[in-house]
Design a protein with these regions (language model features):
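A short helix-loop
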Residues: 101-103, 110
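Active-site and channel-lining beta-strand-loop segments
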Residues: 1-13
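Active-site metal-binding loops of divalent metal-dependent hydrolases
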Residues: 1, 79, 109
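Glycine-rich loop-to-alpha-helix module at the N-terminal edge of alpha/beta enzyme cores
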Residues: 10-98, 105
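Sequence-level motif detector for i,i+2 pairs with an aromatic at +2
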Residues: 9, 102, 135-138
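PLP-dependent aminotransferase-class I/II
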Residues: 108-148
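Residues in well-ordered beta-strands of folded domains
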Residues: 4, 105, 142
């Protein structure tokens, strides 16, 4: 698949957007599935409501997951997913009587999203710099390097 810039130059799309667009571009099966679902119910906020596709996907995810994982929690995207994971880790340690376990370690050069919580965990200083007064404390370690 090629992407074309404003000057008409074409590029092979080898990144899938921000590394999350894994379904390709213009796939007719995906477009048809979206259209069929939109004709039934375009959206139902899963925090309060449910829908048949949401229930089916939850069942499939639970079925494929290791046995200790029996629940699904839907969020709107990657930033919210990482933010929720940080909050879940905090809740876990609080409920286990370990409130002192609050430190987060993340990798330099990493990207976890755009909310304040995950921006703090992100490893790109230039993304964080102007927001540092608002961010939680996170330690950053070296990124993976397979050739060292």
């Amino acid at each position: 698949m090629y992407l074309t810039d404003a000057k008409g130059k074409e590029y092979i799309d080898a990144s899938g957007g921000a590394a999350v667009s894994c379904l390709g571009h213009g796939d007719s099966d995906v477009i048809k599935a979206i259209q069929v679902q939109a004709d039934k119910l375009a959206f139902a906020h899963t925090g309060f409501l449910s829908s048949e596709p949401a229930e089916q996907l939850a069942d499939l995810l639970v079925e494929k997951a290791p046995s200790q994982f029996g629940k699904v929690f839907y969020v709107s995207g990657g930033s919210e997913a990482v933010e929720s994971a940080l909050k879940l880790a905090r809740q876990y340690h609080l409920e286990n009587g370990e409130p002192q376990r609050r430190h987060i370690i993340a990798r330099q050069q990493s990207f976890h999203g755009n909310t304040l919580g995950v921006l703090a965990a992100g490893g790109n200083q230039w993304r964080r710099k102007q927001f540092e007064p608002l961010l939680i404390e996170v330690s950053h370690i070296s990124p993976c390097f397979a050739y060292r």
